[in-house]
């Protein structure tokens, strides 16, 4: 952590190199929050008994998006939103397909586990090397993301027995996509003093803990995590 903090002091947040990388990373977090906003609205339709809670989560994601848009404006950076839409296209399409088929378990794994863990990992690694304005915004966001992760964990734990097979299939289909996403931004993340290995480690810790909380054994988690290597 100290090493990263020292690196942040050396970063020139106004340099064209940094701002170029930031235009894509900032777009990814903006689009990620927009995806989450829309996904929770869809989940509210699929889970009417949890409608109000899911709409509350969707509104929080929209608020997060506005915060990250302000981070871009603070550095005079225009986010590359087209890049970000393509970046999320794999998970986006899989979520839409699952929702159309009424596969709530798959939708929850994609949004409430994979996307939330991806976001938490990215924010955890970014905070020590962020500019002061973005650090304050991101610290506030990451605290709320844990509550979003918790919703998925609680629901899936309560329905674990009947959900396990679908969870395993959804994991196999979607975890490799995360690895491809991480590979895609490795260069830009490095420019911003965020190392891919640290992002992978934090993601796997968050994701493994979530799977454990749902009810998977340690052996199960190791097996499920190995599917990510397919996309490495």
Swiss-Prot record:
Impact noted for substituting residue 123 to F: No detectable effect on alkane biosynthesis activity in vivo
Domain of life, source organism: Bacteria
Reaction equations catalysed: a long-chain fatty aldehyde + 2 NADPH + O2 + H(+) = a long-chain alkane + formate + 2 NADP(+) + H2O
UniProt: Fe cation 2 binding residues: 61, 116, 148
Protein's name according to its UniProt entry: Aldehyde decarbonylase
Pfam families: Ald_deCOase
Gene3D superfamilies: 1.20.1260.10
GO molecular function terms listed in the Swiss-Prot or TrEMBL record: aldehyde oxygenase (deformylating) activity; transition metal ion binding
Similarity field: Belongs to the aldehyde decarbonylase family.
EC numbers on record: 4.1.99.5
Keywords: Iron, Lyase, Metal-binding, NADP
Top enzyme category: lyase
Annotated Fe cation 1 binding sites: 33, 61, 64
Function in brief: Catalyzes the decarbonylation of fatty aldehydes to alkanes. Involved in the biosynthesis of alkanes, mainly heptadecane and pentadecane. Requires the presence of ferredoxin, ferredoxin reductase and NADPH for in vitro decarbonylase activity.
Cofactor annotation remark: Binds 2 metal cations per subunit. The catalytic dinuclear metal-binding site could be either a di-iron or a manganese-iron cofactor.
InterPro entries in the cross-refs: Ald_deCOase, Ferritin-like, Ferritin-like_SF
């Amino acid at each position: 952590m100290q090493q990263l903090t020292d690196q942040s002091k050396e970063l020139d947040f106004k340099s064209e190199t940094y701002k170029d990388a930031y235009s894509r990373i900032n777009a990814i977090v903006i689009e990620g929050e927009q995806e989450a906003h829309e996904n929770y609205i869809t989940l509210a339709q699929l889970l009417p008994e949890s409608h109000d809670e899911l709409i509350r989560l969707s509104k929080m994601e929209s608020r997060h998006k506005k915060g990250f848009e302000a981070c871009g404006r603070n550095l005079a950076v225009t986010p590359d939103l087209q890049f970000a839409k393509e970046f999320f296209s794999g998970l986006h399409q899989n979520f839409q397909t699952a929702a159309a088929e009424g596969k709530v378990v798959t939708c929850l794994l994609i949004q409430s586990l994979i996307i939330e863990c991806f976001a938490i990992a990215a924010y955890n690694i970014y905070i020590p090397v962020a500019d002061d304005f973005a650090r304050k915004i991101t610290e506030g966001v990451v605290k709320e993301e844990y509550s979003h992760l918790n919703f998925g964990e609680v629901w899936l734990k309560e329905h674990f027995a009947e959900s396990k097979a679908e969870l395993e299939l959804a994991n196999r289909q979607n975890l490799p996509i995360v690895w491809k996403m991480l590979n895609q931004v490795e260069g830009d993340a490095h420019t911003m003093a965020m190392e891919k290995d640290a992002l992978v480690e934090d993601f796997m810790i968050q994701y493994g803990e979530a799977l454990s909380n749902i009810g998977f054994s340690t052996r199960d988690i190791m097996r499920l995590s190995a599917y990510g290597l397919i996309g490495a």
